[in-house]
Curated annotation (Swiss-Prot):
This is Voltage-gated potassium channel regulatory subunit KCNF1. Residues 205-223, 271-289, 346-357, 379-385 are extracellular. One of its GO terms (molecular function) is potassium channel regulator activity. Residues 358-378 dip into the membrane without crossing it. Keywords: Cell membrane, Ion channel, Ion transport, Membrane, Potassium, Potassium channel, Potassium transport, Transmembrane, Transmembrane helix, Transport, Voltage-gated channel. The keyword Ubl conjugation does not apply. It comes from Rattus norvegicus. It is a multi-pass membrane protein. It is found in: Cell membrane. Residues 433-468 are annotated as: Disordered. Its main location: membrane. Expressed in brain namely in the piriform cortex, olfactory tubercle, and medial habenular nucleus. Also expressed in the medial amygdaloid nuclei and the lateral amygdaloid area. Heterotetramer with KCNB1 or KCNB2. The chain crosses the membrane at residues 184-204, 224-244, 250-270, 290-310, 325-345, 386-406.
Amino acid sequence: MDASAEQSLPEPGSQDSVAGDDIEIVVNVGGVRQVLYGDLLSQYPETRLAELINCLAGGYDTIFSLCDDYDPGKREFYFDRDPDAFKCVIEVYYFGEVHMKKGICPICFKNEMDFWKVDLKFLDDCCKSHLSEKREELEEIARRVQLILDDLGVDAAEGRWRRCQKCVWKFLEKPESSCPARVVAVLSFLLILVSSVVMCMGTIPELQVVDSEGNRVEHPTLENVETACIGWFTLEYLLRLFSSPNKLHFALSFMNIVDVLAILPFYVSLTLTHLGARMMELTNVQQAVQALRIMRIARIFKLARHSSGLQTLTYALKRSFKELGLLLMYLAVGIFVFSALGYTMEQSHPETLFKSIPQSFWWAIITMTTVGYGDIYPKTTLGKLNAAISFLCGVIAIALPIHPIINNFVRYYNKQRVLETAAKHELELMELNSSSAESKPGGSRSDLDTLPPEPAAREGPSWGSRLKLSHSDTFIPLLTEEKHHRTRLQSCK
């Protein structure tokens, strides 16, 4: 553009620069120039680009409040933003919706949309799922960082009783916190295995003894080992309940309910045996005790507390609820159909084993699940053909949901590894920032401490840019109260 053309361009605030539908502007985002027109941008007047058209009627102060720089000669607005994200954002003016390209961080893209004042409702549903997933990941990272900070933090204002509770809770719930805590976790794991083995060995006739009443009971040595294990489980549960910050939530959590089910049958059976001996009703009491002893198998689920793999498998099964429901529904329909067909086709045989349709359900179940128990089997040609078809349908029904379940397991397992690593990196970054702040001469105040005070932070993680150092700042803090956390890290060193 020559000098005469540049002189003919209107200045901001002049009558010729008033926004119009035919006005043309140039937007330079991260070195990428884009020519836009007023009639296109005016479709969404609440967006930042539409405000650029309107601000031409104002002064330079209005313009520089919306962009990083402005060239009046070229009527070009400069922004130090992500050009790739900008190309996606301006799609709203052409297509009425926004799609996020692959490889762009969903949280950063959301910040870009906020900067350009494009509402999230224009983001397509296929992209909102990625944003929601990334938000959940950051929330989980923030939660883990907060838990670690709570464990590291020592509040001098707290009483000795409260500090003791925190130490006990950390000792029992955080095996990685210290070597003694790791030893206790390993010991608890071994005792779970020992108690489970003892429970199984107690049912071996060769290891049982005969009591004074002539009944076969467990060997006294096995009973003593089980009593010792139950004593350890009881002590562990009571200490964890005593040190829990939220006792109601602790008591209602699944793993703690499993702990209660693992130790409660022992005390109930002991009480019933004592009362039965006094009331001379040993027969009924022994039946109740035997029923309660079955509940001892719940202690094997205590292993899930010490195994991240079992927890991941449980979560994968929860996430695969739809696939499992589809499998059960498919099997239920197949069992009903093939059992009815098998019963009908086998009635012509004089020695048929299919006495009724409900009785044929058992045959259909073991056939479709590829077990083939063999107590009930078809004898006619049509019955055998029906069995072959039911077998093939069962194989297909079981194989279909396996792949989604495995994918959910692998995805969640990898996600947990990534979240753990991200939480550790976030803590290392906080500690590095606190160390650099302490190394500065004249005190431990950093540049962050000299910033103007922030408005009251809302609870939970902050997704927006908290430190507005420039229009281009894309810092995404995981936690809102950064100064507070930095101080706590300093005090924990």
